[in-house]
Amino acid sequence: MPLFSVAIVTLNEEENLPRTLASVAALVGDSREQVVVVDSGSTDRTVAIAREFGATVIERPWPGFAAQKNFAMAQCTGDWILSLDADEEVSPELQQQMRLVLASQPPTDAFYLKRRNLFLGRWMKYGGYYPDPKLRLFRRRTAKFETPLQFEERPVHEVIAFDGAAATLDFDLIHHAYPTLTNYLEHMDRYSSLGAQILVDKGRVSSSLATFLWHVFWVPRLGFLWNYVFRLGFLDGREGMLLHLYHATYTSWKYAKAWEKARRVSDGVSTPGRRG
């Protein structure tokens, strides 16, 4: 049976981490297997909870999403690594399938996991939010997290670059993404600021009024129409309506903030940075 490691990065995740660690406990039953938690300065009980579950805890300053996940994976010793976010949960069915598949010594080097995104506690089945495949399970040292060059303005949405064949498992990784509207809006505020700064750094902010209106006014509305109507997001009820409405708002925020930052730069006014 191949040995298994789980890698998780954390910051103030005391509400989510117990659920995540409980969901992988059966995957690391061998004493040679491990859960590695890399924490970047939690002020709540995150570190204590990780240790209570028997995880190897490393405290390290925050270098960025991809760099922190690369570091966590580098500490893993298993033949296979499962990389998780602290708000993700391995379903019992997925847990069982992972064990069976890895025991069969598959020819593939990596597996996509279908992610079931929850918004205000409801599974978002439509509007492009499912199955949301993520490459999370792979042989050690065959993969590393890299910021995608084709989506540079999305610096926190890291992907895995790897060499080899990949397959998709049948069951779901449950993503407890946004339990409250406040949580979601704070998240979008932070992400839109990060995205705006990338646009400014790459010189992708136009002074044209037409371009400004296109990105701030029209793109959000067309995106909402596409995802909520044509991709059937309305079938996810009120939660679906709110998710697509506020995601469209995020798009508008990102370009409006980029315009604001670029204007401040041109006026010689510094803009305070913020961490992702």
What are these regions (language model features)?
Residues M1-A25:
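N-proximal low-complexity "stem/linker" segments adjacent to membrane-targeting elements
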Residues N70-M73, S91-V265, S270, R275-G276:
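Catalytic-site signature of metal-activated, phosphate-bearing donor transferases
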Residues S23, L27-D30, V35, D39-A48, ...:
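A conserved acidic beta->alpha catalytic loop
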